[in-house]
């Protein structure tokens, strides 16, 4: 059961990390558009194209924030624990993509309609990007801890199995030794009884 728990926790965290990596790419592109949109020489049509793509990326980023794994929200900041062995619990740190800084990226007011808006949007994106980097560092650390816990569990299981095997082998050897000893005693007793009967017959013959 503990091994299954660790496998599920690893899958959960790997899924988090995959979404965070995708979100990083989304924010990088949004930042690039925000820089381009600060060009005051852009035509209205050019700026509109940037804004259209920017809005689509905002929607994509928002979809990432609400992503789920096995019915559980990945990025609501909830910390989780799983039994990593009969005695220990593994901690899954909560990743929160609904902070004020992350919310600013997807806010309706975050637009590229003017150079000033684009500059403000870029600052929000850079702050959100820093938070994503921290979140990915957290998932990386969690995955390393889960791998370590899995290795310890495997070692513990193998050691326990080997111990039981040695105990079982010892029990079998003791039983075989005892049976052999009892069989030898039985044979000796039978031989003594046979010898006694033979002596008695010989004595009777002498007396007769």
Listing of model-derived features with the role each one plays in the protein:
Residues 174-181, 188:
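EAAAR-patterned alpha-helical heptad-repeat segments
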Residues 1-155, 165-169, 187-208:
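Amphipathic alpha-helical coiled-coil/heptad-repeat segments
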């Amino acid at each position: 059961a503990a091994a299954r728990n660790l496998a599920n926790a690893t899958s959960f965290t790997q899924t988090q990390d995959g979404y965070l990596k995708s979100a990083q790419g989304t924010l990088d592109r949004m930042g690039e558009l925000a820089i381009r949109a600060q060009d005051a020489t852009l035509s209205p049509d050019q700026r509109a194209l940037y804004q259209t793509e920017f809005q689509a990326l905002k929607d994509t980023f928002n979809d990432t924030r609400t992503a789920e794994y096995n019915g559980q929200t990945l990025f609501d900041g909830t910390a989780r624990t799983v039994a990593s062995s009969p005695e220990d619990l593994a901690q899954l740190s909560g990743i929160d993509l609904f902070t004020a800084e992350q919310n600013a990226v997807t806010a309706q007011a975050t637009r590229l309609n003017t150079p000033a808006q684009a500059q403000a949007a870029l600052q929000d994106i850079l702050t959100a990007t820093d938070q994503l980097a921290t979140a990915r560092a957290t998932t990386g650390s969690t995955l390393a801890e889960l791998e370590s816990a899995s290795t310890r569990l495997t070692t513990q299981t193998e050691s326990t199995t080997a111990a039981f095997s040695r105990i079982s082998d010892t029990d079998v050897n003791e039983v075989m030794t005892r049976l052999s000893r009892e069989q030898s005693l039985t044979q000796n007793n039978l031989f003594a009884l046979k010898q006694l009967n033979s002596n008695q017959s010989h004595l009777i013959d002498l007396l007769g």
